[in-house]
């Protein structure tokens, strides 16, 4: 590895003629967009929506239809309504697109185009940012940029969030995190970019707090830079803190009713998160301001420690309950029958129990990238050291979080793509001179790790003895709005359906539902589970108490857990074809994917 820090070799690479990233990037974007859009082309973009996408569309429709900006209740969920933990940030561009297009192509056409255009635009933004980060970290090596984009379009865990129909918020969070990494990596050169980075951090958290640990790692890296470099970066760090504090303090009253800021809202942007974000930004401003007047390492360490103690003390004194898991308030019944089986919230330990063959695809590439990035950090130019520390800290936070919740692996794969490409360019400049860098990336891409894990499934099954296979369980499930389309024939009513059917029914019909896959919907989810587990007399009473009009199950993928737990419960009886006298079976669905009963009064 004698060419570890061959700056002359890297300079030659910048001037070497070859593939132009500006030409290849649109080609790769279009290829990826078409590839991940094939299911939508075959089945329709509305059927490509996940449950979260469907619920986001419902929320946007309600807002366009006149629901208040500050009112995030879903009045057709667990009537008379349940609170959602999403903000209006993502609703704004979606509603703007729909309202812009509606006069020209009608509501359905406007929604269809929006479902296609929005994720495609975000994918384009993500690829541009990935290329820019790779350029920044590799000192401008063109092949590193191309390699990073190739890795990104092969980032299997992330691509699902950019398919047509993906409008929930995960794709926007990934894009904002990439932009934050890019801007913060240039913090030593520009106070303006530093301030913009602080704004993007607040905006990401205003959308949702899934990226909070990664953003905290970035803020910690910025604070560490100030401690390390002192006066030479105090202006830029102060600008980052100002952007962070000012934007969060402006976003809070713009998105939330002021009285809600005093409430311990721990699963979304609210008082607790505002305290951490604004307090952290102000702390950075204070540290930078003191350092500009009296710059010593000891004083910087002291002010940093004091700021952390004050901020931590304020948080624990006001919102100590937020230290618990955001799912701590979920009823144990709901946790057992639903939350523990949600794929995107699975921990690494659960994945090893249920689908061990998928672990490599979700975790292999980011973990490998950590090793290469650490080696690149050791051999990099001292002037570039901060950007490598920043990348490693961000990636480490994402990997750690993905061990707890699998869905964060998508962001980890996207952030790892430019870091891995730049690592190879730094470690082996001669490798980056031709196509070998791209070929190596293809061999070590997230998709390759996923393929390796799936191909080794028989051996992995022998070692881990998985309890179930999620893919097999989901193969015949009712997961699209067309599966519930037959319910539009029925008069508007209150529907007791399985959890994953809830958002689909809300999106495609005027009915109200009790259950949906959201942790705040405790009451409705518990009611549905108790009904399905109840013996016939108790089930009759629950239906009467809740004034239910229809009962719906997915007949092609019955809830086997409910059947096993309560073989004489309503779910088991309906699954066996029995119809209690208080229900009337309706023959609505020609595909027979769902079964519907009307409740007799």
Region spans (language model):
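Signature aromatic-anchored transmembrane alpha helix within multi-pass, membrane-resident enzymes
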Residues: 304-308, 426-459
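Start-transfer (signal-anchor) and selected internal transmembrane alpha helices
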Residues: 1-41, 146, 289-307
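Juxtamembrane membrane-water interface segments that cap and precede transmembrane helices
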Residues: 102-108, 255-268, 328-364
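Extracytoplasmic
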Residues: 3-8, 445-601
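Membrane-interface helix-loop-helix junctions at transmembrane boundaries of multi-pass membrane enzymes
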Residues: 230-238, 294-305, 320, 367-393
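Active-site lumenal/periplasmic loops and adjacent helix-entry segments of GT-C-fold
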Residues: 38-138, 142-176, 204, 209
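Membrane-embedded helix bundles of polyisoprenyl
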Residues: 28-33, 118-137, 143-188, 193-228, ...
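Hydrophobic/aromatic-rich transmembrane helices and adjacent perimembrane loops
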Residues: 364-369, 404-442
């Amino acid at each position: 590895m004698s060419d570890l820090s061959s700056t002359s070799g890297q300079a030659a690479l910048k001037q070497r003629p070859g593939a132009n990233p500006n030409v290849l990037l649109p080609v790769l974007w279009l290829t990826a967009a078409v590839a991940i859009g094939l299911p939508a082309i075959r089945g329709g973009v509305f059927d490509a929506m996940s449950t979260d996408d469907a619920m986001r569309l419902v929320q946007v429709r309600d807002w366009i239809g006149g629901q208040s900006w500050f009112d995030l209740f879903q009045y057709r969920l667990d009537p008379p309504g349940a609170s959602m933990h999403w903000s209006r940030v993502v609703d704004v561009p979606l509603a703007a697109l729909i309202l812009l297009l509606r006069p020209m192509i009608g509501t359905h056409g406007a929604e269809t185009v929006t479902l296609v255009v929005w994720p495609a635009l975000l994918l384009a933004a993500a690829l541009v940012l990935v290329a820019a980060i790779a350029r920044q970290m590799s000192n401008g090596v063109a092949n590193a940029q191309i390699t990073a984009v190739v890795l990104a379009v092969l980032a299997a865990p992330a691509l699902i969030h950019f398919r047509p129909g993906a409008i929930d918020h995960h794709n926007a969070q990934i894009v904002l995190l990439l932009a934050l990494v890019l801007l913060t990596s240039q913090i030593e050169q520009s106070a303006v970019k530093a301030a913009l980075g602080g704004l993007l951090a607040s905006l990401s958290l205003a959308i949702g707090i899934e990226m909070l640990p990664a953003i905290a790692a970035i803020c910690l890296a910025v604070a560490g830079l100030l401690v390390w470099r002192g006066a030479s970066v105090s202006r830029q760090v102060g600008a980052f803190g100002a952007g962070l504090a000012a934007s969060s303090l402006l976003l809070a009253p713009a998105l939330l009713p002021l009285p809600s800021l005093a409430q311990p809202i721990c699963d979304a942007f609210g008082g607790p998160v505002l305290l951490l974000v604004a307090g952290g930004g102000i702390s950075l401003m204070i540290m930078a301001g003191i350092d500009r007047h009296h710059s010593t390492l000891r004083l910087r360490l002291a002010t940093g420690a004091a700021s952390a103690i004050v901020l931590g003390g304020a948080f624990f004194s006001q919102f100590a309950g937020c230290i618990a898991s955001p799912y701590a308030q979920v009823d144990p019944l709901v946790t057992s029958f639903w939350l523990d089986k949600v794929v995107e919230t699975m921990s690494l330990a659960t994945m090893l129990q249920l689908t061990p063959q998928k672990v490599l695809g979700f975790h292999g590439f980011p973990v490998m990238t950590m090793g290469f990035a650490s080696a690149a950090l050791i051999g990099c130019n001292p002037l570039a050291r901060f950007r490598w520390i920043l990348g490693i800290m961000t990636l480490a936070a994402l990997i750690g979080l993905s061990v707890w919740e699998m869905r964060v692996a998508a962001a980890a794969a996207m952030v790892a793509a430019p870091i891995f490409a730049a690592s190879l360019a730094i470690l082996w400049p001669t490798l980056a001179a031709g196509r070998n860098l791209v070929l190596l990336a293809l061999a070590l891409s997230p998709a390759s790790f996923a393929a390796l894990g799936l191909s080794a499934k028989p051996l992995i099954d022998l070692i881990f003895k998985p309890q179930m296979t999620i893919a097999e369980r989901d193969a015949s499930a009712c997961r699209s709005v067309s599966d519930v389309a037959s319910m539009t024939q029925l008069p508007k009513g209150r529907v007791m359906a399985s959890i994953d059917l809830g958002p689909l029914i809300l999106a495609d019909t005027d009915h109200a539902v009790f259950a949906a896959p959201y942790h705040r919907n405790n009451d409705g989810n518990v009611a549905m589970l108790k009904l399905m587990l109840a013996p016939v007399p108790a089930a009759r009473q629950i239906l009467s108490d809740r004034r239910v009009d229809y009962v719906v199950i997915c007949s092609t993928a019955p809830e086997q857990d409910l059947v096993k737990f309560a073989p004489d419960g309503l779910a088991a009886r309906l699954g066996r074809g029995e119809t209690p006298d208080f229900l009337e079976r309706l023959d609505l669905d020609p595909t027979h994917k769902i079964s519907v009963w009307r409740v007799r009064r």
